[in-house]
């Protein structure tokens, strides 16, 4: 109830700020949103938690309208993409043909978003997303807003941890796609003028399954770097999606890789697949595998609204949502507030007011202020590690990268 009351206050404040126009548009009472997510594929944990966040946000949004006697109601149509760009494109096209012009949450990654961006821009279809972070999609004045920071910030967090750990050489093992190339390029930029290098590393095509071969090749690069800097000064940077568990499992028993440090990326954090693969979990725990993701709060403190929402999503899905899935909740709420101010469901009109809504919006404990490219301006990053607990393994918060100040705070 407190959650609904707080958002109701925000809702009424935005209504009070609504401009009075000389021409009044017909009221559209049934606003349909669209969400393109992986709901049954290899990366469905993210999609299912994002969907649950969207559903909870719509329940809250509709409760607010009901509380003030408004007939307006929001709903959402979903497309299951399996992270396949062809399915993503067809899903967006079908939504457009059905009259939907507002997308929330998805697409589920940067490669998918890149695939549909031309269609979104050409057809004035607005996407308020929270799962894409590639810097190559940081484009001003398009029809995409991203409620998460781009990977230049994530690279800054990783670089700060590399320096904190006194690592001298980073060996990327990464997806050869929009996301993987973008994050590695950002890491190379972060290394300039700092006391570490980023090796060209080993790339692999999405869908590759030759994990042992790729891991062995990575071990060769680690051995070369260790000869120059010492084994404790070398780190592997894993930039993967669901493949993380397979690579970690393949590395188990490799003496060279067992002596290196291991970092991951935001797409690895809190994934059950790493915990349920015994070999992966054992290796990750042994080498202190840590991975950062945009944080809501810090490693030691999650704001109450975010913690409450996380519990609700976990009850619905069985998964602990990450900060990106939680952000799907805000995507819906921001869309609703923008609709109230614009007085219209027209995507172009909503697009013009989203930045001002985001500048004032901070419900979960994270500012949603956007930069000139329409991405989240800044945020802390929380590093997570895998550790043993009882008879199994868990993800546990480890440290916080404080973006304002560019430093690491251990939990």
Label each PLM-derived region with a short phrase.
Residues 251-329, 406:
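Extracellular/periplasmic periplasmic-binding protein-like sensory domains
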Residues 46-64, 87, 154, 178-197, ...:
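Short, solvent-exposed amphipathic alpha-helices that sit
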Residues 35, 95-108, 128-130, 171-174, ...:
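Periplasmic-binding protein-like
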Residues 9, 14-31:
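Bacterial Sec-dependent N-terminal signal peptides
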Residues 32, 45-52, 64-139, 146-147, ...:
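Beta-alpha junction/loop-to-helix N-cap segments that form part of ligand/metal-binding clefts
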Residues 34-55, 79-85, 176, 180, ...:
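Extracytoplasmic "Venus flytrap"
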Residues 312-326, 336-395:
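Segments of small-molecule ligand-sensing domains
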Residues 134-136, 141-253, 300-304:
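Extracellular/periplasmic Venus flytrap/periplasmic-binding protein
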